[in-house]
């Protein structure tokens, strides 16, 4: 899985690879991240490779994985039911999906990361996964440079 942690330098949003699962968990579960509001949480990108200078902005090289949000309206009467169904739904399709990660998002749903299907664009991969899982395609989240605010495991 391609996982890049986002950081800022001189006002520019840069990214560097996460070394391994241990580092990923340390970043995600750090005390600073436990007390942060959503917009100050650790940010990750799973869908692209950084530019030569490490910058995220304008990145065009696809990684081998795709990050996707599965979100629901918390005000909907069936919100809790839908949230409870997602883990079983995703895990039931993990082989076909090429699932690499499933985690709760900071607000109203889940993040998944899956293997990129060769020959499909980012948007086509997201639409394919949405159809496979029977969840709504998020039209606003199709850019490869999309970042994911990553909450600690206890949120």
Predicted features by range, described:
Residues 53-58, 87-106, 135-138:
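Catalytic micro-motifs at enzyme active sites that drive phosphoryl/nucleotidyl and oxygen chemistry
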Residues 55-81:
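Short glycine-/aliphatic-rich beta-strand segments at the starts of folded cytosolic domains
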Residues 67-68, 96-121, 125, 146-151:
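Histidine-centered divalent-metal-coordination microenvironment in nucleic-acid enzymes
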Residues 78-93, 114-137:
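Helical (often loop-to-helix) elements that flank the catalytic cores of nucleotide-handling enzymes
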Residues 38-46, 53, 74-95:
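A broadly used, surface-exposed interaction patch
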Residues 2-3, 13-16, 96-97, 122, ...:
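Long, low-complexity interaction regions most often at the N-terminus
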Residues 118-119, 133-155:
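Catalytic "initiation/cleavage/transfer" segments centered on a nucleophilic residue
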Residues 1-64:
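DNA replication initiation on ssDNA origins
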């Amino acid at each position: 899985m391609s996982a890049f942690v986002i950081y800022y330098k001189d006002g520019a949003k840069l990214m560097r690879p996460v070394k391994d699962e241990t580092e990923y968990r340390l970043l995600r579960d750090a005390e600073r991240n436990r007390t942060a509001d959503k917009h100050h949480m650790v940010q990750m990108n799973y869908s692209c490779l950084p530019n030569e200078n490490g910058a995220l902005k304008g990145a065009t090289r696809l990684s081998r994985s795709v990050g996707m949000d599965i979100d629901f309206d918390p005000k909907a009467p069936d919100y809790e039911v839908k949230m409870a169904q997602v883990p079983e739904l995703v895990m039931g399709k993990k082989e076909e999906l090429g699932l690499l990660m499933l985690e709760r998002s900071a607000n109203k749903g889940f993040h998944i990361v899956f293997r990129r299907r060769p020959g499909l664009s980012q948007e086509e991969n997201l639409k394919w996964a949405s159809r496979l899982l029977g969840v709504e395609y998020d039209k606003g989240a199709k850019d490869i440079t999309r970042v994911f605010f990553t909450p600690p495991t206890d949120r």
